[in-house]
Curated annotation (Swiss-Prot):
One annotated GO biological process: cell division
Class of this enzyme: isomerase
Domain PPIase FKBP-type: 165-250
Highest taxon of the lineage: Bacteria
Alphabetically ordered keywords of this record: Cell cycle, Cell division, Chaperone, Cytoplasm, Isomerase, Rotamase
Domain text: Consists of 3 domains; the N-terminus binds the ribosome, the middle domain has PPIase activity, while the C-terminus has intrinsic chaperone activity on its own.
Subcellular location: Cytoplasm
Gene Ontology MF term list: peptidyl-prolyl cis-trans isomerase activity
Record's protein name: Trigger factor
SUPFAM superfamilies (alphabetical): FKBP-like, Triger factor/SurA peptide-binding domain-like, Trigger factor ribosome-binding domain
Stored Pfam families: FKBP_C, Trigger_C, Trigger_N
Any one cellular-component term (Gene Ontology): cytoplasm
Organism encoding this protein: Sulfurovum sp. (strain NBC37-1)
Taxon lineage: Bacteria, Pseudomonadati, Campylobacterota, Epsilonproteobacteria, Campylobacterales
C-alpha cells in the first residue's frame, strides 16, 4: 500500500492513497477465519465454521469491516511517513475523498494536529485595569440594606386598620358553591398586603380591616388557574384578622456584626470592612465579565498567529449551527433541510467566529501551562455544587447531569480561563 503525504500547514496534513482490492480481500479472508472460530452454525462444530460459509452469512459486514481495517492501515502508514507523533493528533480525520473504483478505493483524508504556540509576548495584550473602590456611602447603604433584611416582625402596639404594605396574620377558609375546597384553609397565616401572593382581589379587601374583625371576601379564580376545578369560579373566603405586624429595624452595632459574621470577636467596623470587600468584588466581577474578559480574549486572538486544526473548527461550526437550529421554527428548519446551499452559506457566515473561538481555547490552554494555572476536579465539583445550591437545585442531580452530558470539561476550561485572566489582570 502506497500513500502520499502533503503538509497543508502546521496543524493539518493530507494523506492520499489507493486501497487495492487484494488488500480488502485479504482482510475479508482474515476476518472470516477469525469469526469462524467463534461462530456456531448448524451442520458445523462450534469454532469450525469454514470461511466461505461465514462470508455467505455475513458478507456485507465483513466487507465493511475489511475496508475499515484497510483504511486505518492507510492512515497509520501516512502518520508514520509524515513523522507525526500520535499524541499530537486531534479528533477524527476529515474525509475529502472515498471513491470506490474497479481497481480499488481512492482515499484522501486530512489529519489535524495540536497547534504549536510560542507563549511569548502576551503580557502586552493584557488591558490596563484600575481596581474599583467602595465609597463610604455605598458601605452604609449596604449595611442598612442588611439591617433591614435582619429586622424582625413585631405586632404593632397601636390597634389601627390594615394599610397597603402591612404584614398581617390571618385565619381564612375558602368556599366554592358553599363547599370548602382543598388547600383553601389556613390559621395564623402571615401575608404581606400588596405582595400578590393571593389571587387578585383578595389582598385588596383585607385593607381597612381591624383587629379581631371577621369578614367574608368574594373573589374569582383566574381562568388559567392551576387547579382546573377552581379555574374561573367565584369563591368566598371567611377571614379573621389577628394582628398587624411591622419590621423593627435591627440596631447597627457589634451584636449585629457578630450575628452576621458568626464571630464573637467581630465588631461593626469588621462588618463594614467585609462589606467594603464584597462591594469591590462585585464591581470587579461586573467589570471583568462585561469589559475585561471580552477585551483580553480579543487582544490575545489578535496577538497570536498559528494554524488551526480544521476538524476542530468544523466541529465548532457544527455546534454553532445546532445552537441556531434549536432557536429556529419548524418552517425555518425545513427550509434549511431542503436548501443545502443555505446551510453552506450559514457555515461560512459562522466560520470566523468559530475560528476565533477555537483559537482562544488553544491560547488559554497554552498560557495556563506557561503560567502554571490549574483547576482540579474537586474545584469543578465545588463550583457546580455552589451554583446548584444558589439556584435551589439538588447539587448531586446537577453534577450527575453534567457528567452524563459530558459538560464537565467545558466547565473546567471556563474556570481555567477565568483563573488565568484573573492572574494576568492581577485580580
Amino acid at each position: 500500500m502506497k500513500v502520499e503525504v502533503k503538509k497543508i500547514d502546521d496543524a493539518n496534513v493530507a494523506v492520499q492513497g489507493n486501497i487495492e482490492n487484494k488488500v480488502v480481500e485479504a482482510n475479508v479472508d482474515k476476518l472470516a477465519r477469525e469469526a469462524g472460530k467463534q461462530m456456531k452454525v448448524d451442520g458445523f462444530r462450534k469454532g469450525k465454521v469454514p470461511p466461505h460459509v461465514v462470508k455467505k452469512l455475513h458478507g456485507d459486514k465483513l466487507q465493511q469491516d475489511a475496508e475499515g481495517d484497510a483504511l486505518r492501515s492507510l492512515i497509520d502508514l501516512g502518520v508514520k511517513e509524515a513523522g507525526i507523533n500520535t499524541a499530537d493528533i486531534l479528533g477524527e480525520p476529515i474525509f475529502k475523498k472515498y471513491d470506490k473504483k474497479d481497481e480499488g478505493i481512492e482515499v484522501e483524508v486530512e489529519i489535524s494536529l495540536r497547534p504549536t504556540i510560542e507563549a511569548e509576548g502576551y503580557e502586552k495584550a493584557v488591558p490596563a485595569f484600575e481596581k474599583p473602590e467602595a465609597t463610604e456611602k455605598e458601605v452604609e447603604e449596604k449595611l442598612e440594606e442588611i439591617a433591614a433584611q435582619q429586622a424582625p416582625f413585631e405586632k404593632i402596639k397601636r390597634k389601627r386598620m390594615v394599610r397597603d404594605g402591612d404584614t398581617v396574620v390571618i385565619d381564612f377558609e375558602g368556599f366554592v358553591d358553599g363547599v370548602a375546597f382543598e388547600g383553601g384553609k389556613a390559621e395564623k397565616f402571615s401575608l404581606k398586603i400588596g405582595s400578590g401572593q393571593f389571587i387578585p382581589g383578595f389582598e385588596e379587601q383585607i385593607i381597612g380591616m381591624k383587629y379581631d374583625e371577621e369578614k367574608t371576601i368574594t373573589v374569582a379564580f383566574p381562568e388559567e388557574y392551576q387547579s382546573k376545578e377552581l379555574a374561573g369560579k367565584e369563591a368566598e373566603f371567611k377571614v379573621k384578622l389577628h394582628e398587624i405586624q411591622e419590621q423593627v429595624p435591627a440596631e447597627l452595632n457589634d451584636a449585629l456584626a457578630q450575628k452576621l459574621l458568626q464571630d464573637e470577636k467581630a465588631t461593626l467596623d469588621t462588618l463594614k470592612e467585609k462589606l467594603k470587600e464584597q462591594i469591590v468584588n462585585e464591581k470587579t466581577s461586573k467589570i471583568y465579565n462585561e469589559e475585561l474578559k471580552p477585551k483580553i480574549i480579543e487582544a490575545l486572538v489578535a496577538h497570536f498567529d498559528f494554524a488551526l486544526p480544521n476538524n476542530i473548527v468544523e466541529q465548532e461550526i457544527d455546534a454553532k449551527i445546532n445552537a441556531k437550529a434549536r432557536e429556529m421554527s419548524e418552517e425555518e428548519l425545513n427550509d434549511f433541510k431542503e436548501n443545502p446551499e443555505k446551510v453552506e452559506a450559514l457555515r461560512e457566515e459562522l466560520r470566523e467566529e468559530a475560528e476565533n473561538s477555537v483559537k482562544a481555547t488553544f491560547i488559554v490552554d497554552a498560557l495556563a501551562k506557561k503560567e502554571d494555572v490549574n483547576v482540579d476536579d474537586q474545584e469543578v465539583s465545588q463550583a457546580i455544587y455552589y451554583e446548584a445550591m444558589m439556584s435551589g437545585q439538588d447539587p448531586q442531580q446537577v453534577i450527575e447531569y453534567y457528567q452524563k452530558n459530558n459538560l464537565l470539561p467545558a466547565v473546567k476550561m471556563g474556570m481555567i480561563e477565568d483563573k488565568l485572566f484573573g492572574k494576568l489582570l492581577g485580580l
